[in-house]
């Protein structure tokens, strides 16, 4: 790699630099005996966050599948509007999954490739109830993940999760409206 430095060409030996993952190895800066990362956050905190984010990612995969299937199989004129909304929800859930995978990688983890098992019902109202319960569970999980992220000093992550949770709450509102619960 060649870069400019004070109008001179400078060669940089990239072999001297550690890889992104190598830079994430534990160093002991914490006050207890638990290994910590370079910022002094106990590695178990980040591992817990990564596990939680992977669980959230698996739920997003499930949501994508359910929204795609349900938007295509809802029956009845009264469900036309929500069927269109579910298509939008599916694309938003994909955006959430992409962001979660990015954050998991940033924290040094490997994003899961396995989703939670999708649910199905042939009854339109039951499909929406399934989605509503899933959204409510997801919101609860993201609130916990925000708490964990802030405790670990991962404030950018907590802000990303707040953006995601706002969309999940919009999904909850759409589903409650479609079910006549609001």
How does the language model describe each region?
Residues 2-182:
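Iron-associated oxidoreductase/ferritin-like identity signal
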């Amino acid at each position: 790699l060649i870069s400019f430095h004070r109008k001179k060409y400078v060669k940089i030996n990239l072999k001297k630099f550690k890889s992104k993952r190598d830079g994430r190895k534990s160093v002991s800066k914490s006050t207890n005996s638990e290994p910590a990362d370079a910022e002094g956050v106990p590695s178990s905190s980040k591992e817990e966050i990564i596990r939680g984010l992977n669980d959230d990612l698996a739920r997003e995969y499930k949501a994508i599948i359910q929204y795609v299937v349900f938007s295509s199989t809802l029956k009845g004129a009264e469900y036309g509007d929500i069927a269109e909304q579910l298509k939008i929800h599916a694309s938003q859930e994909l955006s959430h999954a992409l962001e979660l995978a990015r954050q998991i990688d940033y924290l040094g983890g490997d994003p899961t490739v396995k989703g939670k098992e999708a649910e199905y019902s042939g009854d339109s109202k039951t499909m929406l109830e399934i989605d509503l319960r899933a959204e409510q569970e997801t919101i609860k999980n993201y609130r916990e993940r925000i708490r964990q992220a802030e405790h670990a000093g991962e404030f950018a992550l907590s802000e990303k999760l707040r953006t995601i949770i706002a969309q999940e709450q919009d999904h909850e509102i759409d589903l409650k409206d479609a079910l006549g619960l609001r």
